[in-house]
């Protein structure tokens, strides 16, 4: 009887990881790389007018000003001040999508809801069978994953593609014609096993950036938990192989230039 893909409770990839059964063991938490004294020394001074400090978005080490009530917020912005939470605006048809684009707002969190959130959004308390991501879970995990706004489309594409794979049986994987989706499944499988061995020490990894048709976006990037964006490079959409002459950079590698040259 083939196994069925299900969501593992990773704090990094809450809806992306793979439940591989008892052979893998209990899921291990993913955490940012430790903040060394050298990294902390590079932090810019915080303005004296800042009423409240909060952790940096992503895996940055530098403190920053918390966002006040009503401020625009999202997964790649600063965090909301104590007692507030970043929520999609009322009536927003795609609340999670809005948060990935910084279109939420810092709103008051009722005390009873704050207690519930603390109890339920912890990765250890998320059911592996759950296919739903709450706004709180999205923010908790994407704040860790997304070092910059450039990371968000890649991470969101990975979630969207994995959602389309979750209901498929492992025995079907070899039959898939879509190369990027095949690789995404294999990468998630490998990462789940590597994380069990590495514990908290796996700070960089690569997730294939697939389009809705299962092929590759020309821009591919690694995810880094070391406080700075990972490297990005350009690939051929049909194969995922790096384009000859393309250079891996931190930021936008401007992949379209290579296709313009070919045309």
UniProtKB/Swiss-Prot annotation:
InterPro entries per record: Growth_fac_rcpt_cys_sf, IGFBP-like, IGFBP1, IGFBP_1-6_chordata, Insulin_GF-bd_Cys-rich_CS, Thyroglobulin_1, Thyroglobulin_1_sf
Top-level taxon in the UniProt lineage: Eukaryota
Domain (Thyroglobulin type-1): residue spans on this chain: 177-255
Residue interval(s) of motif Cell attachment site: 250-252
Residue span, IGFBP N-terminal domain: 28-109
Signal peptide (residue range): 1-25
List of residues that carry Phosphotyrosine: 162
Single GO molecular function: insulin-like growth factor I binding
This protein's UniProt keywords: Disulfide bond, Growth factor binding, Phosphoprotein, Secreted, Signal
Cellular component annotations (GO), alphabetically ordered: extracellular space; Golgi apparatus
Cystine pairs: 32-59, 35-61, 43-62, 50-65, 73-86, 80-106, 180-210, 221-232, 234-255
Record-listed Phosphoserine modification sites: 122, 127, 130, 148, 160, 246
Protein task: Multifunctional protein that plays a critical role in regulating the availability of IGFs such as IGF1 and IGF2 to their receptors and thereby regulates IGF-mediated cellular processes including cell migration, proliferation, differentiation or apoptosis in a cell-type specific manner. Also plays a positive role in cell migration by interacting with integrin ITGA5:ITGB1 through its RGD motif. Mechanistically, binding to integrins leads to activation of focal adhesion kinase/PTK2 and stimulation of the mitogen-activated protein kinase (MAPK) pathway.
SUBUNIT field: Binds equally well IGF1 and IGF2. Interacts with integrin ITGA5:ITGB1. Interacts with VHL; this interaction inhibits HIF1A degradation.
Name under which the protein is recorded: Insulin-like growth factor-binding protein 1
Organism of derivation: Bos taurus (Bovine)
């Amino acid at each position: 009887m083939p196994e069925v893909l299900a969501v593992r409770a990773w704090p990094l990839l809450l809806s992306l990881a793979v439940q591989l059964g008892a052979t893998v063991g209990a899921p291990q938490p993913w955490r940012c790389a430790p903040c060394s004294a050298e990294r902390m020394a590079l932090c810019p001074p915080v303005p004296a007018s800042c009423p409240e400090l909060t952790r940096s978005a992503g895996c940055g080490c530098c403190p920053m000003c918390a966002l006040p009530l009503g401020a625009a917020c999202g997964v790649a912005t600063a965090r909301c001040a104590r007692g507030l939470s970043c929520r999609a605006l009322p009536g927003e048809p795609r609340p999670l999508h809005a948060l990935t684009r910084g279109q939420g707002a810092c709103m008051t969190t009722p005390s009873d809801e704050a207690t519930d959130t603390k109890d339920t959004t912890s990765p250890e308390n998320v059911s592996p069978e759950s296919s739903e991501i709450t706004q709180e879970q999205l923010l908790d995990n994407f704040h860790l994953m997304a070092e910059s706004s450039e990371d968000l489309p890649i991470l969101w594409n990975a979630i969207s593609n994995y959602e389309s794979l979750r209901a498929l049986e492992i025995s079907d994987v070899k039959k898939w014609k879509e190369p990027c989706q095949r690789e995404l499944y294999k990468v998630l499988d490998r990462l789940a096993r590597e994380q069990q061995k590495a514990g908290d020490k796996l700070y960089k990894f690569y997730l294939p950036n697939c389009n809705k048709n299962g092929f590759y976006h020309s821009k591919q990037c690694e995810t880094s938990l070391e406080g700075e964006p990972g490297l990005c490079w350009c690939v051929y959409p049909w194969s995922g192989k790096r384009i000859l002459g393309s250079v891996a950079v931190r930021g936008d590698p401007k992949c379209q230039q290579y296709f313009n040259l070919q045309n």
